[in-house]
C-alpha cells in the first residue's frame, strides 16, 4: 500500500473512532467536503476542494469542471426519502466526481451517512463483490438498477457495529486497488 493510501486509511478509521463522523452534515456537499478533508488533509493540497480541471477514468469523462459547481447544487437538492432516491443521488455525485482524487472512498462514507440518517441502514460493504460493484458503478449513469439491486442486497440495520464499519472502510480501499498486504 502506498504511504498516502495507508495514511488515508488510518484517517478513515480515526474519522469514526474519534466521533468526528457525527459532526458531518448528511447529504450535503459541505459534508462530502468535510469527509474528503478528514481523509486527505496533509496528503493532498486539494483536500476538500472542488476540482477545476476535467477528469476521466477508464474512458468515462466525469462532469465538466466548468459546470461542476452548478451541478453540485442540483445534486445536493435531490431527495433522500427512499433507497432509490438515495442511490440516485449517489450515482449523480459519482458522475460529478467533485475531487481530483479520492472520490470513491469519500462518497461511500457519504452514502452510508445518508442511508443511516434516512433509512436507519448502511451497506455492509465487506460482502459487496469488487468486480460486481465496479461494473454496476460503471453502468450506473445509464441505468442504476444493477447498482440498486446489488447494494440493497447488503443493507444492514446494524449501523453502529464497529466491525461492519471498519471492514467496510477496508473494502472501500480495496475497490480502489489498495490492499493492506501491499505495505
Tell me what each language-model feature is:
Residues 1-183:
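FIC/Doc superfamily catalytic core
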Amino acid at each position: 500500500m502506498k504511504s498516502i493510501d495507508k495514511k488515508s486509511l488510518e484517517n478513515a478509521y480515526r474519522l469514526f473512532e474519534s466521533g468526528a463522523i457525527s459532526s458531518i452534515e448528511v447529504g450535503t456537499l459541505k459534508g462530502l467536503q468535510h469527509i474528503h478533508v478528514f481523509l486527505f488533509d496533509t496528503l493532498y493540497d486539494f483536500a476538500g476542494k472542488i476540482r477545476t480541471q476535467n477528469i476521466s477514468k477508464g474512458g468515462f469523462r466525469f462532469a465538466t469542471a466548468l459546470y461542476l459547481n452548478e451541478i453540485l447544487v442540483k445534486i445536493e437538492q435531490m431527495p433522500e426519502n427512499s433507497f432509490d432516491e438515495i442511490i440516485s443521488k449517489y450515482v449523480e455525485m459519482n458522475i460529478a466526481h467533485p475531487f481530483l482524487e479520492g472520490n470513491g472512498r469519500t462518497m461511500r462514507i457519504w452514502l452510508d451517512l445518508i442511508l443511516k440518517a434516512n433509512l436507519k441502514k448502511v451497506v455492509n460493504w465487506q460482502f459487496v463483490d469488487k468486480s460486481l460493484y465496479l461494473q454496476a458503478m460503471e453502468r450506473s449513469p445509464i441505468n442504476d438498477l444493477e447498482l440498486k439491486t446489488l447494494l440493497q442486497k447488503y443493507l444492514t440495520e446494524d449501523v453502529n457495529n464497529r466491525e461492519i464499519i471498519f471492514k467496510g472502510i477496508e473494502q472501500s480501499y480495496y475497490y480502489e486497488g489498495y490492499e493492506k498486504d501491499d505495505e
